Amino acid sequence: MTPQDFYRTLEEDGFSLSSKQKEQFDTYFKLLVEWNTKINLTAITEENEVYLKHFYDSIAPILQGFLANEPIKLLDIGAGAGFPSLPMKILFPNLEVTIIDSLNKRISFLTLLAQELGLENVHFFHGRAEDFGQDKAFRGQFDVVTARAVARMQVLSELTIPFLKIRGKLIALKAQAADQELEEAKNALCLLFGKVIKNHSYQLPNGDSRFITIVEKKKETPNKYPRKAGLPNKKPL
């Protein structure tokens, strides 16, 4: 998917990018490739692949109608090089985006990236989701939490649901169907008062299958969740 293919496909979906937005995606690509030689951000660095498998893939929840261009508070867990939240932010500038990442070098990249792209209302924090999930400044504060290929739902639910407001939504982007994952996550979702409200499949323009699972938070998360850093992965609920 060339940049021109990307613009044209978005236009067909009803999103006509401004010259500023096109420049932002171009700068994003160039900085991603430049910084990838210093720190491991992605295995995908070829321009057409980045536009398809990072940029287009990241904005899929918008294209599929699951997000609006409103000043909602969105948290991205395990965003790595900023996916999916920063391509979403370029497309929908009204989003207020927060990223938590456990690697300080990635936070340095994201901070520079946001400055170079001229993004406002973006916040980056270095640390573990399990620790921030017990911090009152973060816990129960977000309308949406996104996670792209971060962990299985059984683990992911504990890392994300505590951050949501009641009726807030987890949007999980997956490369594989999540049926088995959701079966395994039933207990975790029950304990965390999360309910799967949508399982959506779609295709990238090249025909690759992708999946979005949306979980809504129904009640306050019990205080003991999330557990200490590392435990959700070692001993899933």
Swiss-Prot record:
The record's section on Pfam families has:
GidB (PF02527)
Which terms in the Gene Ontology molecular function aspect does this entry carry?
A: rRNA (guanine-N7-)-methyltransferase activity
**Gene Ontology CC terms:** cytosol
- Compartments it resides in: Cytoplasm
In terms of CDD domains, this protein maps to: AdoMet_MTases
Q: Which UniProt keywords apply?
A: Cytoplasm, Methyltransferase, rRNA processing, S-adenosyl-L-methionine, Transferase
Q: What is its EC number?
A: 2.1.1.-
Q: What class of enzyme is it?
A: transferase
**Binding residue positions for S-adenosyl-L-methionine:** G78, F83, A129, E130, R148
What does this protein's UniProt record list under function? Specifically methylates the N7 position of a guanine in 16S rRNA.
Q: Which HAMAP family match?
A: 16SrRNA_methyltr_G
Return the similarity comment: Belongs to the methyltransferase superfamily. RNA methyltransferase RsmG family.
Q: What is this protein called?
A: Ribosomal RNA small subunit methyltransferase G
Q: Which organism is it from?
A: Streptococcus pyogenes serotype M5 (strain Manfredo)
- List the taxonomic lineage: Bacteria, Bacillati, Bacillota, Bacilli, Lactobacillales
